[in-house]
């Protein structure tokens, strides 16, 4: 299955312009040079800083990942440098009592001046890599405040199913003696059918990452 371009309709000339000027690079983590990591770290730090300095802090010192390290990335470039980014990592999660192989998606960011470059465009670029990884599902988590936004961009186009009423248990990215080693969050789940239909997604009200989020 491939995602046709009409699943991401343009809302105006501004969005068309943003899409046409961005050049996408799909790369494995081992292909990135030190300069790539430094550039991505600066981009992600600026992208996540508006949501709080705590969220931007992991990207200090040239580190281009926050928790678990990604396996493959889709990076959009334009004349100003990095314009957009999304990453994926294969891992087993436990959905209820079922162990399930997924490609976790995360580290999504778009430069503020390119608001027309939607997450659906990033997924079109990432999709061939997810097929190559041989996973049944793509998996991501987002805050409840983004539900309407993501339903408009992904759900209505059929790119993903948004699942609510699920708690996600993860390990902290860094061990601290003054905090529990795991945390449980009430999040929205994004499920992208890749090699299997959505009907094969297991039922369950808690998901164990058994590791840090991407």
From Swiss-Prot:
Gene3D superfamilies documented for this protein: 3.40.630.30
InterPro entries found in the cross-reference section: NodA, Nodulation_prot_NodA_CS
Gene Ontology CC terms, in alphabetical order: cytosol
Keyword terms: Acyltransferase, Cytoplasm, Nodulation, Transferase
Enzyme class: transferase
Assigned EC number: 2.3.1.-
One Pfam family of this chain: NodA
GO molecular function per UniProt: acyltransferase activity
UniProt entry tagged with the keyword Metal-binding: no
Keyword Cytoplasm: yes
Subcellular location(s) per record: Cytoplasm
Chief localisation class: cytoplasm
Primary role: N-acyltransferase required for nodulation. Acts in the production of a small, heat-stable compound (Nod) that stimulates mitosis in various plant protoplasts.
Family: Belongs to the NodA family.
Protein name in UniProt: Nodulation protein A
Organism of this sequence: Methylobacterium nodulans (strain LMG 21967 / CNCM I-2342 / ORS 2060)
Name of the encoding gene: nodA
């Amino acid at each position: 299955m491939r995602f046709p371009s009409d699943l991401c309709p343009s809302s105006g000339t501004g969005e068309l312009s943003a899409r046409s000027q961005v050049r996408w690079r799909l790369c494995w983590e081992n292909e990135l040079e030190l300069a790539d990591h430094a550039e991505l770290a600066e981009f992600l730090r600026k992208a996540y800083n508006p949501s709080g300095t705590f969220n931007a802090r992991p990207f200090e010192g040239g580190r281009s990942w926050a928790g678990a390290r990604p396996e493959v990335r889709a990076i959009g470039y334009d004349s100003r440098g990095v314009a957009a980014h999304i990453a994926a990592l294969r891992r087993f999660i436990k959905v209820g009592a079922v162990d399930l192989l997924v490609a976790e998606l995360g580290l999504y960011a778009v430069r503020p001046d390119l608001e027309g470059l939607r997450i659906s465009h990033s997924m079109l670029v990432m999709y061939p890599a997810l097929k190559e990884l041989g996973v049944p599902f793509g998996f991501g988590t987002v805050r409840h405040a983004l539900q309407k936004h993501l339903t408009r961009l992904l759900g209505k186009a059929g790119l993903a199913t948004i699942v609510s009423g699920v708690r996600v248990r993860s390990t902290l990215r860094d061990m601290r003696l003054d905090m529990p080693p795991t945390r449980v969050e009430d999040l929205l789940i994004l499920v992208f059918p890749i090699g299997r239909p959505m009907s094969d997604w297991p039922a369950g009200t808690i998901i164990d990452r058994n590791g840090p989020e991407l």
